[in-house]
Amino acid sequence: MKSIELIDIESIASDRAGITREDGVIELLSEADEALGRRPYPSSPTIRSTEANIDESIGNRQLWLQSIELNGEFQEDDSEEVEETIGKKPDDALVCSDACSAPDVSIQELLQTFTPPKPHAGRVMKAGAGPVRGSSRQTSSKLQTKDVLQDILVELDDNLSSWDTPSTSGIRSPETVATLAAKWANKTEKTSGKPLYGRPRSSGNRGNILLKRTLANRNNILSSELGGESSPSLQALTTPLPAKSNDGDKNQTTNVMTTGGFRLGTMEKQTLNGSACVDRIQQVPVSSPESVSFLEGLSDIPISKPVQLTQRCIAATNTGYTKDNCASTPRSAAAVEYLEPIDTDTSILSTAGEALPHSPVKPSKVSRERSKRDYIVHSKAFTAEESKAKIRQLMSNTALKKQFNEVNKVTREKQSLLAEIVLSINEQVHQYLLEQKVPIAEVLGPTTVIHNFESVPIIRFKRKCTSMYDLNNDIYYPCETTMCNEPICLLFYNAVDFFTKYKNQKQRLYSEVQDLKRAGNKVIIILNEYSRLEKSLAELENRCMRSRVEQQLTGDKSPRRKTVKEVQLTALEMNSKDLGRKVNEMIIKCDIDIFPINSAASFANWISNLVWVVAKMRYDPMMKNVNWSHINVKIGKTPTEVLSKTLQQINGVTEIRAGRVTSTYPSFQQIFTDFEKGYLVAGKDGNPLMTKVAEKAMNALLMSEDPEEQIYIN
């Protein structure tokens, strides 16, 4: 490596082409010296300090700083060769590029008047070890390499601020500082391998670097599109696509090189027991003169707080498809794709019962029969021999054969089905409906209405069964008329009475509901005049507010007489917004359904539809073959419509949200392909296409290998 010696002497025109000697140092003088007098060498660092600060700093500590403010052209220069300037004319284009600006001229004035301090004890000074500045006006003193470098790096606050503050000099990496130190120390070692840290430097044009794979999260610390030669916040993150996870691979290491406040180093993500992770930043040692660590002595130096990136914040590059070298789901090359790793943890998914969503144990035949028996009353599981004997007995008699054919008809009339249902209504509820001029018996038609005198306002469904159902052979056998209870019941409350009981007798209300559920009933609570109560509470709030304002204005504090209704509403100690919250609390805690209705007439219309559903439930082929009820069910005409209808069955996925998914994945095949890769493409706005619950449900639906695995739908 050739040493460049800056010599400042009072030369004349006749000496510009000559060679002189001073103190044993050969001085090369040419026309370029005049240019050097006007404009310093482009690699000269900018020093904004005084002589007193340099003396005090050199005397107190020895510094090898992490970053300094250098001109962009010198930082981009990694070569150790310098063109000879003898006999060349000064050319600004060769001295400095357009991307960098000339340093301050104050560096020459400082070096002209600066007298280096005496070396510290134990330090060996070698002649010719670094750049020398000769002066004809002052004593010719030679600054050693380490002293010059320490003088340049002494301004800690200014230099560190230049590292955190984006500039127009391009992307800067501290790896050039080590090369700079090697240059000035007159070292000839060359790094043939990869750089010690950061991204390897390319000699060509950087080009626009786009992060093709990032997370579909608006709160992501990475910008949606990073690129451009002058982008100060450019971050290069490289990580392999997550393949199928192995049990042995629990540590993932990602090399990160960032600018603008990120600390250089190696980020290691360690998973502890598969649940918690620890991000650890380790500093990489850098070679420096005399084997001094480049980052040594920086423990007391304030530096920017590092940003620790978790695994969800790591993006992988891609060039046109959702996975490299895969021809599925093509994307536009000009657009940036956002891919989010799929979380396959289905622990948050739940089913209607208490069974685990992913039970590894295959449900037994008895459990399937029990679930079928819950919907088909008066049923029994007959063996093959028992069924043959029963059929042989029925076919031997003409009357029994006629009854056997009658109970096994495929199509049944609506009136005959409604005639099988018996509605047991609480006496108080029946009287209330009559007071509201709702003749429930006439509304229900062929359905029989009877009264019960239970302590709760309950409505039970019963069925007059003339046959027994064989759960194993799907056959009805004629029998004597038997009254059976259907697994469904209603609790009819006026909204005011319900919330009064909820406030004063909450535990009793919960106990009544749980007793009905333990008996195998599906409990539905009807809240009559719910909207009327909501409006009454809102009006009461307005009257109370108006009364308080009038009292403050007039000073009249005489109590106003309240009506019975106002007293009842005031005793609830609720406002109009509390009603919905109380209803949701009851639904979640008791696992029941609550239907608010406006009037008794609306209830009559609603219960007539419910009676028809209960009446045909025992003979519905879907209920008799629950495990195969999905066969031959067409929910759409096109693959996109089928996918949309399937997504809408997931809780919380509306038609609009399903359309958001189908706009990116028009068919099951395309979304299945990306589920196999472990990533899903985000929407055009950068947000996820589905919620976490919907994503987990779809992942279990498409990727599960267990045919008995349960999926949360609704």
Curated annotation (Swiss-Prot):
Which InterPro entries does this UniProt record tie to the protein?
ERCC4_domain (IPR006166), Mms4/EME1/EME2 (IPR033310), XPF_nuclease_EME1_ascomycetes (IPR047521)
Q: Does the keyword Metal-binding apply?
A: yes
GO CC, alphabetical: Holliday junction resolvase complex; nucleus
UniProt keyword Translocase present: no
Q: Which coenzyme or cofactor does it need?
A: Mg(2+)
User: What molecular function terms (GO) are annotated for this protein?
Assistant: DNA binding; endonuclease activity; metal ion binding
Query: Which keywords appear in this protein's UniProt record, sorted alphabetically?
Result: DNA damage, DNA recombination, DNA repair, Endonuclease, Hydrolase, Magnesium, Meiosis, Metal-binding, Nuclease, Nucleus
Q: E.C. number, please?
A: 3.1.22.-
Q: Which domain of life is it from?
A: Eukaryota
What is its subcellular localisation?
Nucleus
Give the main EC class.
Answer: hydrolase
* GO BP field: double-strand break repair; mitotic intra-S DNA damage checkpoint signaling; replication fork processing; resolution of meiotic recombination intermediates
List cystine links: none
Predominantly, its location class is nucleus
Region (Disordered) residue spans: 223-252
Compositionally biased, Low complexity: which spans? 223-234
Q: What does this protein do?
A: Interacts with MUS81 to form a DNA structure-specific endonuclease with substrate preference for branched DNA structures with a 5'-end at the branch nick. Typical substrates include 3'-flap structures, D-loops, replication forks and nicked Holliday junctions. May be required in mitosis for the processing of stalled or collapsed replication fork intermediates. May be required in meiosis for the repair of meiosis-specific double strand breaks subsequent to single-end invasion (SEI).
The similarity comment for this entry is:
Belongs to the EME1/MMS4 family.
According to the record's subunit comment, the protein's assembly and interactions are: Interacts with MUS81.
The molecule here is called Crossover junction endonuclease EME1
